[in-house]
Amino acid sequence: MAEQKRYIYCVIPTNQERKFDLVGLEGEKVYTMNYRDIAAVVSNISLSYEECDPTRRNMKTHTLVLEALMKDHTVLPARFGLISDSGDKLRELLQKYYPTLKDYIKKLDNRMEVGVKVFWEKEAMIAELEGKDQRLTKIKEEIKTLSLPIAEQKLVKAGEMVRSMIEKWVDRYTGRVYLELMKIAVDGKKNYPIDIKNIINSAFLVDKAREKDFDALIDKLDSEYGDKINFKYVKPIPPYNFVNLELYLKEVL
């Protein structure tokens, strides 16, 4: 008889076996598989790793379970699709990586991950650049009176100038905002921008006791730079940026 497969949501600190009032994938109950004072939070599943599709419904279920657990527990989140085909192997991995998992729990205890994305305002940026460098305005005026071949050359020159100016502009605001936020955050991580207008795509680890301080700083920066850049601030989110659970539990696949 094949052993029961289990879908893994996260690891939490607990010395008690728990059954949560939560609905997991395939409508299954969510419960713990324990080792000492930590546990993997799982639900039974019939699918293999290859068969578990990241449908909108499945992704939402995964996220809702994590969000519910985050209210009362320090959570080391697993990304979608981590499935164990052996309960014994899962417990062996909890034992093997117990010191590392405990270190992560200690790092994340009473802390929260927040996401900060910053986008530049095109018109405000161009207006500021033109105000600081009259060469760009001069080239734009010259182009209006030039023949097409010469105008195209001027456009290339203007494009190169704008690209260089934008890079410096982005670096200036990125540095200012990120460094200000790091004055309150315990840790931070810079991720790749999601599009051309996204100049900051970062995650910050913040003490829950300083959540309001961080909120106030976001408001202050938004007021200070709001005509040039826009903030998107999301909290709390599962701390994926500060723990890579798959690195340790991928052996269950």
Predicted regions and their residues:
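An interfacial alpha-helical scaffold signature
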Residues: 1-232, 236-253
